[in-house]
Amino acid sequence: MSLVRNSSRLLRSQLKRVQSVPVALYHENVVEHYENPRNVGSLDKKDVTVGTGLVGAPACGDVMKLQIKVDENGKIVDAKFKTFGCGSAIASSSLATEWVKGKSIDEAGKLKNTDIAKELRLPPVKLHCSMLAEDAIKAALADYKVKQQKKVAN
């Protein structure tokens, strides 16, 4: 009888271990940006030197806000993000804010989701996260440009 009890305990512990194995394994680049995200926060969206991009993916529910602060020479001097989503979305936001800092508006506009996906080594099922980051950058740049046009018009 004790042999049956011991075997049953062993089987249960092995089943628990199998059930706790993660379904998806993330590359260390994703894990690093997820566990230690860079540039989390917000900038003052009323500031004319700040562009704000807010994008979402209805299919998965990810929402990403990315903001840039641009100096008088057209150089991005700061970037912040807030993302509600999976680890890949957070990592994509974090990497995107790192990459746009120090770039001109034109250079930042050339950043592609494929660059983000390649750096993070995102699997095909997570490519939409890097697309969201690209869309958020483009939306932030567009918002900044609209503010600048309004400033010149006044």
Curated annotation (Swiss-Prot):
Pfam families, alphabetized: NifU_N (PF01592)
Named cofactor requirement(s): Fe(2+); [2Fe-2S] cluster
Record keyword Metal-binding present: yes
Annotated pathway: Cofactor biosynthesis; iron-sulfur cluster biosynthesis
Gene3D superfamilies in UniProt: 3.90.1010.10
A Gene Ontology cellular-component term: mitochondrial [2Fe-2S] assembly complex
Alphabetic keyword roster: 2Fe-2S, Iron, Iron-sulfur, Metal-binding
One BP term from GO: [2Fe-2S] cluster assembly
Cofactor binding, per record: Fe(2+) binding protein that acts as a scaffold for the assembly of iron-sulfur clusters. Binds 1 [2Fe-2S] cluster per subunit.
MF terms in GO: 2 iron, 2 sulfur cluster binding; ferrous iron binding; iron-sulfur cluster chaperone activity
Family stated for the protein in its record: Belongs to the NifU family.
Function per UniProt: Scaffold protein for the de novo synthesis of iron-sulfur (Fe-S) clusters within mitochondria, which is required for maturation of both mitochondrial and cytoplasmic [2Fe-2S] and [4Fe-4S] proteins. Component of the mitochondrial core iron-sulfur cluster (ISC) assembly complex; regulates its activity.
Quaternary structure note: Component of the mitochondrial core iron-sulfur cluster (ISC) assembly complex at least composed of the cystein desulfurase Nfs1, the scaffold protein IscU, the accessory protein bcn92/Isd11/Lyrm4, and probably fh/frataxin. Interacts with Nfs1.
Protein name: Iron-sulfur cluster assembly enzyme IscU
Source organism phylogeny: Eukaryota, Metazoa, Ecdysozoa, Arthropoda, Hexapoda
